Amino acid sequence: SGPGHFTPTLENERPLNIYGFSKLAFDHHVRRRIAEGSLPITVVGLRYFNVYGPREAHKGRMASVIHHFSKQIVDTGKVQLFEGSGGYGNGEQRRDFVFVRDLAQLNLYFAQAGPWAPKAGEKRQTWQAVVNAGSGRSRSFNEVARALMQVHGNARIEYIPFPSDLDARYQHFTEADLTGLRETGCDLPATSLEDGVRETFAQTEPMLV
């Protein structure tokens, strides 16, 4: 759970919870089928990082942390971040936040055959890939709070104790290695955190409750 550990290769695949394990189990199933030569279709696995965007209120507690922080600021005038943990200072734990529109465009890219669409007269080829789908840049929770304040106005940051029982299951750092994605020929631009937050809450602030 540190820098350099987010390349989708076997030595780096150590899920921290059952949800991650279930995703990895399916990837292994597909990889085995590929190795056996029994999967004659194009399969692309996109490993999403921390997705956020407009219209998340209906998701309740499963909404993104950016949505929850925004609601805290609107409702209470403050945002609660964890104190230092995992070698990171107060609020300095980092995540790769990816704007939902970027992922929609990425899915469409591959759904439309991406780099593998056959040219006129060519036979369609089949390809397989498991790649990261993120922005490629980690940002701290302090930076998230500051980006939200640009939209909602100043708020107080309150640092709360990090739960000791969470340490072994918590990702203190995530950043997508996009090498595999770039190798497919996909070079779609990533929306910055600041621009994504601004667009998200310009549309949805009345629906935060």
Map each language-model feature to its residues:
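Active-site helix of classical SDR
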Residues: 22
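C-terminal substrate-binding subdomain of Rossmann-fold SDR/epimerase-dehydratase oxidoreductases
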Residues: 74-209
